[in-house]
């Protein structure tokens, strides 16, 4: 594996910029999921354990959704799969917003999970197909930053709309999905030609070449990256899901979680130019990941001791800076590990880390906060990140020894 430090601005194709902008629009309403558990408790009268179970059901449904997304991208094309996922999400979110009881909300949550991850593998594969290996870390970091900017707007929207009723958050989310679908439909190429995984280039002697199909499940490098990615995804999902519950447990307005996440995004955007400083741009992947997880550990440890909204701001800036250093690196490595034409399937398997985390996070958040309190949850998250600050660099070195994967810094 070769780590190439990008010391100058890296241009990415227009297709990547358009996709990032469309996903940012989609993300404007995406904060509704952070309030799914709270809404079921406050609006539909569910217990915290029941609401956590329904949220876990949503997360469980995202696991096959991610795999279906990878397969559909190969068969239907990337753009069609993205559109199917976005419209499916919008329909399910409107169902949650209008649900008269817990049973209907649970069914709609499961349907939302089945549609929720359909568009991720084709989105990530579209970036891999449109960029050179040296551009990928920057391209995936651009997508991450665009989603973060959308999250900042989502946090402000959640803080404003949430005071009028939690159901309205899901209506806004549905509208953002449809707006994103419109941009994708009008501005991105169809991608509905025969995918690269089905093309058979001629052999050097002019004859037909037999295409070797490589199963992602048999690649130990991918499985190791997925295991590490699951830990990061779990911590991130716990922040998203547990923050409103933590605020509520400490007597604060759970809708204020939107302001906290907006502060996290502001930190991510404002500090991003730091990545272009030669000293930072020259960091190896191992050092950047180790430092990133260490900063996340410090920030989440600060959450354990914060008891006011203002007290959460400094820890939020710290863990968000750590997230910035991690941004885009794992996706670039996974995309580079994939054989030609297999990027969607590799990224779909790696993306299962988010499905697993989405299942586990609501259950852990409700159980730990309900029985031990918010401080125990945030302390546990800090310990996980501290451990990953050692594990992730070791994993990166292992992949380096076995592969030649160019990974540029996310400058």
Task: List the model feature ranges, each with a label.
Residues 45, 77, 98-103, 305-307:
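Helix-breaking motifs and short loop linkers at transmembrane-helix boundaries and internal kinks
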Residues 108-147:
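Cytoplasmic helix-loop-helix junction between adjacent transmembrane helices
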Residues 176-197, 391-396:
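C-terminal membrane-cytosol helix-exit motif in multi-pass small-molecule transporters
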Residues 1-13, 189-227:
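Juxtamembrane intracellular "pre-TM" segments in multi-pass secondary transporters
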Residues 80-94, 287-301:
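Structural signature of the two symmetry-related core transmembrane helices
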Residues 9-59, 221-261:
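Helix-loop boundary and gating motifs at the non-cytosolic
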Residues 31, 59-67, 151-152, 265-273, ...:
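Residue-level signature of mid-helix packing/kink "hotspots" within the transmembrane helices
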Residues 65-77, 271-284:
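Helix-to-loop junctions at the C-terminal end of transmembrane segments
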């Amino acid at each position: 594996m070769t780590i190439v430090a990008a010391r100058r601005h890296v241009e990415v194709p227009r297709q990547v910029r358009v996709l990032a902008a469309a996903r940012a629009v989609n993300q404007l309403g995406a904060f509704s999921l952070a309030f799914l558990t709270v809404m079921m408790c406050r609006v539909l009268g569910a217990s915290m354990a029941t609401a956590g179970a329904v949220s876990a059901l949503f997360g469980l449904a995202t696991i096959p959704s991610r795999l279906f997304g990878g397969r559909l991208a190969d068969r239907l094309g990337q753009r069609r799969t993205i559109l199917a996922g976005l419209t499916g999400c919008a329909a399910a979110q409107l169902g949650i917003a209008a649900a008269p009881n817990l049973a209907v909300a649970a069914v709609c949550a499961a349907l939302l999970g089945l549609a929720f991850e359909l568009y991720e593998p084709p989105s990530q594969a579209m970036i891999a197909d449109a960029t050179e290996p040296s551009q990928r870390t920057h391209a995936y970091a651009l997508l991450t930053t665009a989603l973060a900017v959308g999250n900042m707007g989502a946090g402000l929207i959640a803080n404003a709309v949430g005071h009028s009723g939690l159901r309205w958050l899901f209506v806004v989310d549905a509208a953002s999905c449809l707006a994103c679908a419109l941009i994708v439909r009008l501005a991105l190429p169809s991608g509905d030609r025969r995918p690269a995984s089905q093309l058979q280039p001629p052999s050097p002697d002019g004859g037909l070449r037999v295409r070797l199909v490589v199963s992602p499940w048999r690649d130990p490098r991918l499985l190791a990256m997925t295991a590490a990615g699951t830990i990061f995804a779990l911590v991130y999902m716990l922040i998203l899901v547990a923050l409103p519950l933590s605020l509520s447990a400490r007597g604060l307005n759970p809708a204020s979680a939107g302001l906290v996440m907006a502060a996290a995004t502001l930190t991510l955007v404002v500090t991003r130019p730091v990545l272009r400083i030669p000293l930072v741009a020259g960091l190896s992947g191992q050092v950047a990941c180790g430092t990133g997880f260490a900063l996340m550990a410090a920030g989440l440890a600060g959450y354990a001791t914060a008891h006011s909204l203002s007290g959460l701001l400094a820890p939020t800036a710290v863990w968000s800076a750590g997230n910035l250093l991690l941004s885009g690196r794992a996706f670039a490595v996974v995309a580079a590990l994939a054989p030609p034409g297999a990027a969607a399937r590799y990224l779909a398997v790696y993306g299962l880390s988010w499905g697993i985390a989405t299942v586990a996070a609501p259950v852990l958040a409700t159980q730990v906060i309900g029985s031990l309190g918010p401080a125990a949850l945030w302390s546990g998250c800090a310990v996980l990140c501290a451990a990953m600050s050692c594990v992730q660099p070791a994993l990166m070195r292992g992949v380096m020894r076995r592969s030649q994967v160019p990974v540029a810094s996310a400058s």
